[in-house]
């Protein structure tokens, strides 16, 4: 195995978290569809797909590194929220937890002198900065006096 067992275990746990995030964002897209917020529906669908791609990236890395891969069950996701702001706030909270997980993994990789694993994690750490910034900005704007229909112009298109 080309990476530490400790990091491999954490990455396997992260696979579940990435698939979980994909489910959560898909549920949020369903919620937005019910509100006829097509821009937000598309935004959350893209977020869902992106999280799935993150999980697959980890699966491929573990496989190529000769580490065991486990795919655990992912619980269902909510499709109802009190407001669009609630959905975006929960997204930001979740992305912050994911960022914490990747920082912990980077620390474990360093402690085990796992340079390969540490290098792999750098992309995810950069990605998390972007994700947190997007959701923090969206949350801040939604906390203003915008109603959901005015907010329809907010979600990034790509």
Please name every model-derived segment:
Residues 1-158:
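Iron-associated oxidoreductase/ferritin-like identity signal
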